[in-house]
Amino acid sequence: MDLLNFLDDKITEEDTYTYSLTDVLKIRAEKEPKKTAYIFLKDGEDEEERITYGELYQSALTIAGKIRKNSKEGERALMLYPPGLEFVKALFGSFFANIIAVPVYPPRKNRSLNRIMSIVDDSEASLVLTTDYIHSSFHKNFSDIQSLKELYWIVTEGINAGPKFSGEIFNEDIALLQYTSGSTGTPKGVMVTHKNIMRGSEYIRQCFMHSRKSTSV
C-alpha cells in the first residue's frame, strides 16, 4: 500500500480501498504539477482549455476554503454547471471541503424547474455551486421561488485567491449523490462513496489497460 503506486502503474486493490481521488490529486500535484490533468473539448472536438494537476489542486483547495467558510461538513451542495473545467474544479473543491456534491444539469430556457426542485427537496441541499452566468440567470428568471432564494449561492468561477481548506477524507464517506433523469418519474438519488469512485476508476483502468501515459476521451 503506497500512494506513489498511482504514479508508477503499480496500483493494488488495497490502494483503492485506502486512498481517495483527493489523495491521488495531491500526490500528482506534488510530483507532476505541470502535467495536464484534464482537457475540455468544445463540441467534443476542438480544445477549449486545459488544466494541470498543480493548477487543479490549488483551485480545488481555494474553492474548498470558500465553501467551508459558508457551510459545515456533510452539507449537500447542488452543482449547476455547463460542461467544462469549472465543474471539475468545483467537484474536487467539494471533495476537499467534505461536503456532498449533487451534480445537476442546469435547466434549458423555458424548461420546467420541477426536476431541480425535486432534487433540492430530496437531497436537502443547502448550497449551490455554479458559474456567474447561471447564478445571474436563475436570480433573473426565478427570483420568486422561495426555496431557491433560501439556498446559499457560491460562484466558484474566478476564485483564485483566499484561504485554502483540505479536510480529512475517508473512503466510506459519501462523495456525491447521483440522480436519475426523472424522465419516467421523480428523480431518485444514489449515494456514491469515495471508495465507489476509486474502485470504479480502477476497474476501468484494468479493463482498458490504461497506464500513466494514457489519455482518455
What label would you give each PLM region?
Residues 75-80, 95, 175, 215-217:
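Short, well-ordered beta-strand segments
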Residues 10-19, 114, 147, 151-174, ...:
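Flexible, low-complexity linker/hinge segments
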Residues 16-39, 58, 175:
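A short N-terminal helical cap/helix-turn-helix that marks the beginning
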Residues 9-17, 43-50:
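Acyl-group handling in specialized metabolite and lipid biosynthesis
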Residues 33-36, 153-154, 160-179, 185-186, ...:
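Conserved pre-ATP/AMP-binding loop-to-beta segment of ANL
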Residues 34, 38-71, 75-88, 92, ...:
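Conserved AMP-binding/adenylate-forming core of the ANL superfamily
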Residues 92-103, 121-122:
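Short hydrophobic alpha-helices that are characteristic scaffold elements of the AMP-binding
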